[in-house]
Amino acid sequence: MIECWLVSKDGKHGRIRLPHAETVVIGRGPETQITDKKCSRHQVQLMADCNKGYVKVKQLGTNPTSIDGVDIGKEQKVDLKPGHTLHIVNNLYPYVIEFLEGATNPHAKRENENRSSSKRTQENSLNEGTGTSMKLMKKESNISPSSSSGKNSSCSTEEKYNAQEVKSQGHWSQGLKASMQDPTMQVFKDDKVVVIKDKYPKARYHWLVLPWQSIANLKVLRAEHLELVQHMHAVGQKIAKEHSDSKCAPFQLGYHAIPSMSHVHLHVISQDFDSPCLKNKKHWNSFTTDYFLESQAMIEMIKTHGKVNVKDGVSELLKTPLMCHICRKEQANMPQLKEHLKKHWPT
């Protein structure tokens, strides 16, 4: 049975178990060893879903609780996934969550944790000893939504990043890291990036460009990543260009402000949004509001500021009314919106 644990990144105290589907409230107190008066004794409410691999976080206190630097908002709820960092208050007291196989007694649980720690140490040693050279992979021709790469070569740079991700491929929110290594999903790869088909495409054409380097989210990006994100953009443009014609909707390249999956990825998506996987308002607004950060704009942001600025409260954009991205007419529901889109992009 999978168990969820809240782990202090400061290492100030032992991990806190979050039972499946049970409410746990933490804040200032002996359990967390937080003495900061700006932190309420009931600062956050946590509820783990061990089946889906995330924790629902609700801010109860007055001062801000945040995930990866983005404030949640009082009485608001946000999903915390493995690989992301929860700061209890005022960007202080960082925590992460881990999902582990449950044990039958506390002694066995400690052994599980020790084995996990030992495994991480061994993987770190492996990473340090891995080389950094890599051969450039030739892109397979005739990329299409249903096509896949027919070749899979091993190369040391790719293996280095693979080793870093092995321990986290078991949870759904880490699914991109597993798909990156799946030859049937790959349509292109080189020494810096891999392109895969989106497993649940939200349009006729929908790919993801991912760096081999492990980068959790946009907040981590800095000036030293500029060359990498420019390369990701160039690769995305190349793939889009191969499918651009008079009958095809234009493409958009960009990133979700707060991605649902861990590991930075660039969306290359056609603007027809003709897909059965596009099911709800959240899906739609994640691509048609400012929640979707255009790739070129993000590159300019890194050039100018040396980082990516994600606006506070950006998640609220996912709740805005459904509106056609072409004519800006508001639609009552998803079926009506999908029918309306056919006027712009006939099948």
Curated annotation (Swiss-Prot):
Catalytic reaction list: a 5'-end adenosine-5'-diphospho-5'-2'-deoxyribonucleoside-DNA + H2O = a 5'-end 5'-phospho-2'-deoxyribonucleoside-DNA + AMP + 2 H(+); a 5'-end adenosine-5'-diphospho-5'-ribonucleoside-2'-deoxyribonucleotide-DNA + H2O = a 5'-end 5'-phospho-ribonucleoside-2'-deoxyribonucleotide-DNA + AMP + 2 H(+); a 3'-end 2'-deoxyribonucleotide-3'-diphospho-5'-guanosine-DNA + H2O = a 3'-end 2'-deoxyribonucleotide 3'-phosphate-DNA + GMP + 2 H(+)
Active site, renumbered: 265 (tele-amp-histidine intermediate)
Biased composition (Basic and acidic residues): 108-122
The EC number(s) this enzyme carries: 3.6.1.71, 3.6.1.72
GO BP term, example: DNA repair
Chain location of the short sequence motif Histidine triad motif per the record: 263-267
Example of a GO cellular component annotation carried by this entry: nucleolus
Residues with site note (Interaction with DNA substrate): 179, 256, 267, 282
Keyword Nucleus attached: yes
InterPro entries xrefs: FHA_2, FHA_APTX, Histidine_triad_CS, HIT-like, HIT-like_sf, SMAD_FHA_dom_sf, Znf-C2HE
Biased composition, class Low complexity, residue ranges: 142-156
Location of the region described as Interaction with DNA substrate in the Swiss-Prot/TrEMBL record: 198-202, 260-261
Disordered, as annotated region: 107-176
Domain FHA-like positions: 23-72
Protein name: Aprataxin
Species this protein is from: Xenopus tropicalis (Western clawed frog)
